[in-house]
């Protein structure tokens, strides 16, 4: 009996240890993001915090308006990661600043978290935020003519699922979504029993009914999938599989590896404090230039 149980116990112990280490990494990132945001420059943009895009407490976004807008005033909507159970927009001021200084308006959104709210709640929240920004663009002096969705980790899954979803929420500016940029995103994996994110999904629902990989359709959106060279959280196959499926459907997709970074550090390396030492922001800018060129 013990011999039969031993492999299971070993797997369970490994899962617990993995979850503990990732939890530690999130806590370290919280401290790091606090420091990044304290050191983030306040020049070159204005910010309106806690804009209510819906009626619930987590229906909030921070809106960064550039002081030197590009042509057509493109809007980046950023969705944070955190295994669908952790994270807050306040930790990502450095994202707003990093791209507002490049001529983009940036909306950084909150969304409802697991385990209280499981898939597709966070996807519906993103769609609601997009519709709010579209309706109120004149009020906030922004434009939804050129929208770029960008997300990290779980947030990358969310932005991809906003388009590729079993029962998509109607997005009013759907035809104005020019590009999707996924940073270290999980797009094609089995979450059943996963030690990190099992509580974010209905365990009785097969992943084939959830993952955006299975709902890709042909469109004119440009897709940019960035993976971290040293990612030990999200498997490379997620981006490789999605890139292949997008191309099979005739879509535009680019798969790029960012060297010398891991899963958590990928997003921090975008900040003005660290972007000179890593190529993450450079590759995102390359994607933006490619997506928005005439």
Residue ranges and their predicted role:
Residues 23-70:
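N-terminal cap/lid segment of alpha/beta-hydrolase-fold proteins
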Residues 90-108:
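Short amphipathic alpha-helix adjacent to the substrate-entry channel of hydrolases
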Residues 117-138:
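Alpha/beta-hydrolase active-site loop
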Residues 131-195:
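Primarily recognizes the serine-hydrolase "nucleophile elbow" in alpha/beta-hydrolase
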Residues 185-215, 221:
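Mobile cap/lid helix-loop segments that gate and shape the active-site cleft of serine hydrolases
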Residues 219, 225-227, 231:
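Short beta-strand/loop motif that positions the catalytic acidic residue
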Residues 232-238:
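Conserved alpha/beta-hydrolase "acid-adjacent" motif
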Residues 240, 249-294:
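C-terminal catalytic histidine-bearing segment of alpha/beta-hydrolase fold enzymes
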């Amino acid at each position: 009996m013990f011999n039969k149980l031993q492999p299971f116990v070993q797997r369970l112990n490994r899962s617990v240890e993995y979850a503990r280490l990732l939890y530690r990494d999130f806590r370290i990132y919280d401290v790091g993001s606090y420091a990044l945001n304290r050191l983030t420059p306040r020049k070159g943009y204005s910010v309106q915090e806690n804009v209510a895009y819906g009626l619930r407490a987590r229906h909030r976004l921070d809106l960064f308006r550039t002081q030197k807008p590009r042509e057509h005033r493109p809007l980046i909507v950023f969705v944070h990661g955190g295994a669908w159970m952790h994270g807050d927009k306040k930790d990502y001021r450095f994202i707003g600043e990093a791209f507002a200084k490049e001529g983009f308006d940036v909306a950084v959104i909150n969304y409802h978290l697991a385990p209280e709210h499981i898939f597709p709640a966070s996807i519906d929240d993103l769609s609601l935020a997009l519709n709010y920004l579209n309706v109120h663009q004149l009020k906030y002096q922004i434009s939804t003519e050129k929208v770029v969705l960008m997300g990290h980790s779980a947030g990358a899954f969310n932005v991809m699922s906003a388009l590729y979803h079993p029962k998509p929420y109607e997005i009013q500016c759907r035809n104005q979504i020019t590009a999707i940029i996924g940073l270290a995103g999980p797009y094609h994996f089995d979450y059943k029993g996963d030690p990190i994110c099992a509580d974010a999904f209905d365990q009785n629902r097969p992943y084939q009914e959830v993952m955006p990989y299975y709902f890709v359709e042909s469109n004119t959106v440009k897709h940019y999938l960035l993976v971290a060279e040293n990612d030990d959280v999200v498997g490379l196959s997620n981006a490789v599989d999605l890139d292949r499926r997008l191309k099979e459907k005739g879509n535009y997709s680019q798969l790029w590896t960012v060297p010398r970074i891991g899963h958590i550090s990928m997003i921090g390396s975008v900040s003005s404090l660290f972007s000179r030492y890593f190529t993450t922001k450079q590759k995102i800018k390359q994607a933006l230039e490619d997506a928005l060129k005439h």
